[in-house]
């Protein structure tokens, strides 16, 4: 509790004690009783009266403070002092509870996102470390990150090796090993060795700064449910005030005209009860709190949602489109099959190809050298020639070796076998004879198949894969992962056209999400209903372009984000239905004179407390991550 909340708690206790003492006293003169009951009322309710008067002064009277002030002052005017005090006391109890709940949610999110560094260490000429504000550190400055400290600014390690804890950014507990030459991003915690880092960005442009801005501004983009409640309260509160006024005067006037007793006091009491019941606090407070909790819970899992509107749209997503490379696959090439001719060996074929490709920097060449797994003896390789669009030729141990595609083999007068192309084929010829081939492909991520299955379980109707790869490759990956539809051989511009077709084909109330790695995906991310950037740790483009940012490259996080969104939306609608149903029933009973002021207190404070308790569930995602 804050100091202000503790002070309010003491005021509530004091007011309750005074009311109990006054209730136990023998009957007193009416004027004395009024003055005595005004003491506990003002002790706990003065700030409500003050806010109501300020609202009237500013010509914005219709809020919960105005409703409570009119209801309680009216109760005092009717001589119902205990009920008047009870209404204001329990209203303040509800407000206190709501304040504590909201504060707890905000503190939980702040703790989850407590990644802002307080300082950066700069090494002076005498070797001593000076702590400076991260905002003052320029690009290219050498900073020192000691064990236990957060990396304050993005940069490259120039000296040292260590293990980094990235849990605050990715939600993953598995640490990451780094050494000289590796890039590091701000917000990670250095767990072991001392690191010297050359900064590559200013603090304002670093990853931690962008993430903090994203989380802080997430409440600006409100969901449809939030906007509905705001508009509803704007119309609802004045309407119930006029309704209460009509209830207080029209029935007794009609009764008078009919020659029956008017009983003005009874009808005014009903109107005051009507006012207490009608307070919209449960909705106005619990709906934003639910979305706030959902966004905070997602942040704890390394999923950054830029606003409650995207959380709501994610819950309504029924079509998910993937960019293959870097999203469903690792985006790195790997030798997955080695096929030597009869009489040859896999090791000798890989060795010949790796040595021939030893001078090439092409990703295919790098994957072959990785498969070889040994140091390249450059002295064994001579006369290297790289042939654009074909491959390479070289002499290895004095023998001519060629490694490349079928066109290179044809150029050498060699026939190659008919190989089903489910990846990149590198044919190898040694000493003028065909020696076999290597199959190289982009490796599917370990969790991709399960991620697609989880999306189906989360309510996704159709999954689509877009890729620039050839038809056989796209078909094989699609079949392996269980994707419903794929489109192959696409250029970057073709992806936007394909998205337009998918948007036109979906049902009106369905949302379409696109999942990319944030690289060159900005046009597509901005066109779809929900743009999701995966593996955005350190990617400025992804953080800027996407609506939902996954801080690591685990595709399973997409289904988790949808489960969080669906659970949050469910909580929101539970609160709306619950609050409106209880209030509607109590309003009817109050208007009929069946429900008294005590029932009104429950309908207001009780419903608000239960709705806020339900809303705080959105913050906790442990049971969702285990599915």
Regions found by a protein language model. Give the residues of each.
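Membrane-cytosol interface motif
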Residues: 63-68, 108-123, 298-324
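Actuator/coupling domain of P-type ATPases
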Residues: 22-27, 37-123, 136-143, 150, ...
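Bilayer-spanning, highly hydrophobic alpha-helical transmembrane segments
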Residues: 12-16, 227-258, 271-291, 573-602
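Juxtamembrane helix-loop transition segments at the membrane interface in multi-pass membrane proteins
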Residues: 53-61, 97-110, 289-308, 616-627
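Cytosolic catalytic headpiece
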Residues: 111-112, 126, 308-530, 563-566, ...
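Flexible metal-binding regulatory segments at protein termini and peripheral loops
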Residues: 1-30, 102, 126-129, 209, ...
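Residue-level signature of catalytic and energy-coupling elements of molecular machines
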Residues: 52, 80, 101, 120, ...
